[in-house]
Regions:
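Feature captures the catalytic cores and cofactor-binding loops of soluble hydro-lyases/lyases
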Residues: 7-10, 20-130
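Phosphate/diphosphate-binding glycine-rich loops and adjacent basic-rich segments that engage nucleotide
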Residues: 131-137
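Intrinsically disordered, low-complexity regions enriched in acidic/Ser/Thr/Pro/Gln residues
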Residues: 2-9, 14
Length: 137
């Protein structure tokens, strides 16, 4: 079993789920359907794939100030990822998790990890503890 230490960007619930490593950046506004949890952008390589319940590894985001609202809707509907791993913080996206916490919703943890480590995560089961330690199975 391999372990990786991450930096916690937003505290949230520990998670155990399959990693979904996106191969291209995504915009949550128009790129993710908040009613289904599916990648809705027809130009995205993983169009139609569900992010719900997965450890979502984002190689980047395509900015929109509405990304926070879409993530908040996903949390509220129970369709959010189990955790989010970014290679660099995205303040707008993370704001959705912070607002969800303020509204007393259980929220996924957001973590920072070097993009180079994403490759070893694809389709693996990740267990993330409260301290941001990832165990790869």
């Amino acid at each position: 079993m391999t372990q990786l230490q991450t930096e916690i960007l937003v505290k949230g619930q520990p998670a155990k789920a399959e990693a979904l490593v996106l191969t291209a950046p995504i915009s949550f506004w128009g790129g993710v359907n908040p009613k289904t949890g599916l990648i809705a952008d027809v130009r995205h390589p993983q169009h139609g794939v569900a992010i719900t319940g997965k450890v979502l590894c984002l190689p980047g985001t395509i900015g929109s100030s509405s990304a926070a609202a879409v993530l908040l809707e996903l949390v509220y509907a129970g369709l959010a990822p189990a955790a989010i791993i970014l290679h660099e913080p995205d303040a707008i996206l993370l704001l959705g998790l912070i607002v969800a916490q303020e509204m007393d919703h259980g929220t996924p943890m957001a973590l920072k990890l070097d993009r180079e480590a994403f490759g070893c995560l694809s389709h693996k089961i990740l267990q993330i503890d409260a301290g941001g330690m990832i165990s790869i199975r």
